[in-house]
Amino acid sequence: MHNMEEVREVKVLEKPWVEKYRPQRLDEIVGQEHIVKRLKHYVKTGSMPHLLFAGPPGVGKCLTGDTKVIANGQLFELRELVEKISGGKFGPTPVKGLKVIGIDEDGKLREFEVQYVYKDKTERLIRIRTRLGRELKVTPYHPLLVNRRNGEIKWVKAEELKPGDKLAVPRFLPIVTGEDPLAEWLGYFLGGGYADSKENLIMFTNEDPLLRQRFMELTEKLFSDARIREITHENGTSKVYVNSKKALKLVNSLGNAHIPKECWRGIRSFLRAYFDCNGGVKGNAIVLATASKEMSQEIAYALAGFGIISRIQEYRVIISGSDNVKKFLNEIGFINRNKLEKALKLVKKDDPGHDGLEINYELISYVKDRLRLSFFNDKRSWSYREAKEISWELMKEIYYRLDELEKLKESLSRGILIDWNEVAKRIEEVAEETGIRADELLEYIEGKRKLSFKDYIKIAKVLGIDVEHTIEAMRVFARKYSSYAEIGRRLGTWNSSVKTILESNAVNVEILERIRKIELELIEEILSDEKLKEGIAYLIFLSQNELYWDEITKVEELRGEFIIYDLHVPGYHNFIAGNMPTVVHNTTAALALSRELFGENWRHNFLELNASDERGINVIREKVKEFARTKPIGGASFKIIFLDEADALTQDAQQALRRTMEMFSSNVRFILSCNYSSKIIEPIQSRCAIFRFRPLRDEDIAKRLRYIAENEGLELTEEGLQAILYIAEGDMRRAINILQAAAALDKKITDENVFMVASRARPEDIREMMLLALKGNFLKAREKLREILLKQGLSGEDVLIQMHKEVFNLPIDEPTKVYLADKIGEYNFRLVEGANEMIQLEALLAQFTLVGKKK
């Protein structure tokens, strides 16, 4: 796996700059001064009405107090941990020096700092049970990492989980797994001992003489006041009797049945002794009987420290599967020879087949087809070992393919057309280097002599153009990553013609140059393909993750009054918790207004819903009401509910929202986001202060783009900046996305790169095409249209949109502009109705020509 770092250099997982440079405070919001000023007034006064405007998401999640968590290397109940830090107070409490275990973006276990702990109340929980005996009680919106039946691996809200989903479970925990004689002695005592304080006596019972002997040796070593004797009774049972005040004091301090804190530093010794006393082989598994649920849960955590995945059934812990049994015997083992022999036989048996996950076959197939990979496995479910091996094999081939595509892109990045003006300037040098006479070169320059392909290559080479190398790169791309049919479709010719052109030495260089541009576009499409990046990220996760997927068997809702707790882990927003180790989540949001109003408490006073995802009246009646019923945290006078895309709500849902807004107006403020305020019913609009976000000024966007370019080490040319501003049309998100896309091509941001990644034609090209038509040069205008379509890969609708924008910049009178704008609208309607786009675009140019002739 050491070569995986090389794969990371492909940078397929770079965070979108739109998120990276998202404003965190009101002062960072660009170009909406009128809105910021009003919002700051609300912050200053500490009050605000309902608002109608747009903003980003975020919501907090919590667990019940009996949830177990490893913090600073020790196992705690979440309740115990949070109550100790918070002093019992509700809301968030900052904390330093507290570390928990979680997973990073590749599914690898890491230690994370906790920023603060949190305590709250709720009336609704979701209880989740799994095949391995896990039980989690979490708030309905708490996300859990799951593997769904369609192969997706994603965070899913607890209330949306279904039986059959598989829950992410760590395969091991980085806890101390050492040896310790006291831990071993306690393992024997809890497994087969009994204390009688009145008689000052400790008894240990076990039929195995080796274990009795070991218990006596440890007792003598650990307790200097111990008097030890072994007695075999008439019924044949043998017991060890110990008189020791020191030993009695220790065992009386242990409390309820659980793993004593003294045992964690020597957990290996404890487990071996405890399993020797209470464990054994039953059927195809090692089974351990414990004294309590608490003990069985803690045993599961302890086993996870050795990479042993276990299953809980009430008070029993079960270890099954050849791999898990083998790990147990290698890491812990039995001293009892009979148990050891039986367990060794289990190693030879096959695993039961539960250690696997469902694969996102569609996504992996997409990666395979996009990069023309040869290696593949068409199974829909892979074992953990298969997932590691197959995804790693795929990643090796992917790395090779991406590297080859980058090299092909470099080879195709320079045109192969000869600049004959340059040849004329350097005619003597060219003649000398090529062996072609100067007079022949002049005839080539003037077009009086037909140039052979052989001579063309010679001349191009002198000018620094390696035509043969470029053609070979074109052939490689066509054979390995595309098809003659695809290239032919974009070129507007038959695939057989493309093959002939690429494979023959009698080449039409102008057509070859067009093919080069098409192939370069295709390469860039592959390298910037978001779904491909998603697929590669998925495979990296499969190849590196350290997770087991435990199938969910039951999901149920609990009602009542519950105290809930959370740990805030910045950055990765997850930690390992549960009655058995499970990956759970915490999250944050980036709503500038909430940060300003609530400070550190904003997370707990803010709820986000997306109406387009959760349409209908149930959203209003359940989720909104549940959140609105709870009191604000941290002394705030109200909470905020942010409802994104509110115009997607049905009329009934909006009426319910209106009633809810009235019902909870004393402690809740709503922020509604919509694309069209006209779709929001009037009673809601009348209850909101309406904020209309206008397109940003070019100078505001330019300032932000220059800042980002400087931070990212880019050279943002003035031409490149103006091109971005032209395309963005006042949309900051679009501008930043274009900048990031252009940066993937080159650190120098030019207008050429911008128009290329944005799939837009240059405005001057559009104007030139329209002016040619107006001047009566229909055929040249038609040729220019085809050049634009092929060069930029635009759709007919894209061309019409740009024509509509540029027609008002033409040097013609206003009535003509009005007429042509109307015609553009008419032909756009024809395209929407399904007409042939080339015929309609050429017909529109014909209309321009007819108008021009009338003038």
Swiss-Prot record:
This protein undergoes a protein self splicing that involves a post-translational excision of the intervening region (intein) followed by peptide ligation. The intein interrupts the potential ATP-binding site. Signal peptide: none annotated. This is Replication factor C small subunit. Heteromultimer composed of small subunits (RfcS) and large subunits (RfcL). Residues 185-308 form the DOD-type homing endonuclease domain. Belongs to the activator 1 small subunits family. RfcS subfamily. GO terms for biological process: DNA repair; DNA-templated DNA replication; intein-mediated protein splicing. The lineage of its organism: Archaea, Methanobacteriati, Methanobacteriota, Thermococci, Thermococcales. One of its GO terms (cellular component) is DNA replication factor C complex. NCBIfam families: intein_Cterm, intein_Nterm, PRK00440.1, PRK04132.1-2, PRK04132.1-4. Part of the RFC clamp loader complex which loads the PCNA sliding clamp onto DNA. The keyword Signal does not apply. PANTHER family: REPLICATION FACTOR C / DNA POLYMERASE III GAMMA-TAU SUBUNIT, REPLICATION FACTOR C SUBUNIT 4. It comes from the Archaea. One of its GO terms (molecular function) is DNA clamp loader activity. Keywords: ATP-binding, Autocatalytic cleavage, DNA replication, Nucleotide-binding, Protein splicing.
